Amino acid sequence: MTSAQKPVFSPSDLQTWLEIATEAVLAAGAEIFSLWGKVQQIQEKGRAGDLVTEADRQAEAIILEIIKRRCPDHAILAEESGQLGQVDNPFCWAIDPLDGTTNFAHSYPVSCVSIGLLIQDIPTVGVVYNPFRQELFRAATSLGATLNRRPIQVSTTASLDKSLLVTGFAYDRVKTLDNNYPEFCYLTHLTQGVRRSGSAAIDLIDVACGRLDGYWERGINPWDMAAGIVIVREAGGIVSAYDCSPLDLSTGRILATNGKIHQELSQALAATPQWFQQYAAARAQKI
């Protein structure tokens, strides 16, 4: 997804791509909604708990048809189909046809369609649609962020102890000690609460529109976060690596906040190992 030659595009191009992504998420969202409660095929994709249904596949097929027809020269990175097109193409669509598949498979209505356009690996256009709440989030670099065509902004919460956060847990959480459990425990102590939706894209848009103040997670893929990153940034938030350095999509780690608690949340994540060691020792003495 890299290129030595800098791609050339205009604000009107961004608007066009935004409309293409919107067309695709709405069409896929309608398909997902029509299959609600009717899923018959649920499979695991090689990792325990990593599910795929016919809704994922059918929604992705709809999106791919639209993107390929409207942007035939662009590459695609889709959750179910993988990499399509040349790896070094500077324009690459990152597609999650159904983010929150496990929720969907259990008839828990917290899922969405997420489509982001990466330009030289930088999330530049993002659209997320939640068909169960009929919420359409859109953003493009320098064009702002909207919810159902109305501008949105991140929250104004200025301290971690007043914040409401959200996180998630990777599919390999049972097999690794780097599973986000200590961070979840520590941040629960430091904040007004930590939620878990089961959809990275929904977590990001909830930060973007001010429902939540911050989000962190490990073990996620570019298609999980590409669209949401643009939306958070255009809503006035900050997205980075855990240590506040520039985000690298390939690491699978992301920190996104309203900006006001960003440094404090980053410091808390860094302090987690020491806190958890002390907490575990103290708990062992009491049991």
Swiss-Prot record:
UniProt xrefs under InterPro entries: IMPase (IPR033942), Inositol_monoP_metal-BS (IPR020583), Inositol_monophosphatase-like (IPR000760), Inositol_monophosphatase_CS (IPR020550), Inositol_monophosphatase_SuhB (IPR022337)
Enzyme class name: hydrolase
Cited PROSITE patterns: IMP_1, IMP_2
GO biological process, one term: phosphatidylinositol phosphate biosynthetic process
Binding-site residues, Mg(2+) 2: 96, 99, 224
Cofactors named for this entry: Mg(2+)
UniProt record similarity statement: Belongs to the inositol monophosphatase superfamily.
UniProt-recorded name of the protein: Inositol-1-monophosphatase
This protein's encoding gene: suhB
